[in-house]
Amino acid sequence: MEASLDDLKSELRSIVGAADIVESGESLETLSKDYYWYSPVLKRQLEEKRADMAVRPGSVDQLSAVVAACSRARVPVVPRGAGTGNYGQCVPLYGGVVIDFSRLDKILSLEGGVARVQAGARLGTIESEARKVGWELRCMPSTWMKSTMGGFFCGGSGGIGSITWGGINAPGNVKSLTIMTCEDSPRLVRLEEAESLKALHTYGTTGLLVEIEMRLAPKVDYDQLILSSPSWDTLLDWTHEAAKRLEWRKRLVTQFEWPIPSYFKPLAKYLRPGDSVTFLLVDKAQTAEVVAHAAKAGVACVYNRPLTDPPKPPFITDYTWNHTTLWAIKADPTITYLHSGFGPNFRQQFA
């Protein structure tokens, strides 16, 4: 096995160059991990797992040559975007080669309301470039400034924007994707429309995602609002109504019960101790209407900042989705989370 790995390393060096192969040290450890440690179960299972090497192909041809070499050597490969997932999808269970997609990051086109990009393109870059030409991403994770399109499609499901457009698997969001097969002579396979969802959330097990076309949404100028109430039920009633109001152009609706907001230290001066809060991204042309509607319901707006264009922090999205867990862990490392789903009768389910 060692001789085989040594031979493979030599071949991979000849393909990508010595500067784009990582064989040891902290860099290899980093490229072998994601945020799996959010889960105490995965932390125990995965903390000793790592790749034998990592490579950074800079073209589709280099990627094909790397995959072919690994296939011939019968060495497992694991694709990696930015490593911002929480479930260990990019952690190699059996050593082998991590393929880092960070150099395959081109935005190939932004035309007709469709982004055509390589798998390693960062969502933050796509969002910024799309907004320049009147568009924005339909949905993206809270890690959007760092995450890649390939990582989001293969390891994510939804996020900011899903309140309006649904998750990645909602009809029409994905136009097409191109996958590279893992075999001695790799092939490129194009899947279109609903067929492309066969590869959704499969972490590369169905092949390596090379290129993706995602439909975009018309650009909206947003305000970032935090709404507050000492009553969870009062806030929930208002937030639920806000979420259902189709005439309000929204990108985020997230409610937090106290003491969760106490973990958001950078926002402490805006938050009222004991209050539950709702974070809202809404069309700035509708902000006054939304704030007035909330006030009539007994809900106060305690934070109102525009989302700049191009987007620059601070972002209230940095406290939503799985970022919430990250802030909680900073306060108490023993905290983790469970996903729960609720139906239209969620109030009865709470009881």
State the predicted function of each range.
Residues 31-34, 240-351:
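C-terminal substrate-recognition/cap domain of FAD-linked oxidoreductases
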Residues 7-19, 65-73, 129, 238-246, ...:
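Generic non-transmembrane alpha-helical segments
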Residues 2-3, 227-235, 339-348:
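Short, surface-exposed ligand-recognition loops at beta-strand->loop->(often short) alpha-helix junctions
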Residues 106-108, 119, 123-124, 128-247, ...:
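FAD-binding subdomain of flavoenzyme oxidoreductases
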Residues 1-68, 84-113, 260, 264-266, ...:
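N-terminal flexible segment immediately upstream of the FAD-binding catalytic core
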Residues 53-58, 223-228, 278-279:
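Short, well-ordered beta-strand elements within core beta-sheets of diverse protein domains
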Residues 82-84, 142:
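Short, ordered loop/turn segments at secondary-structure junctions
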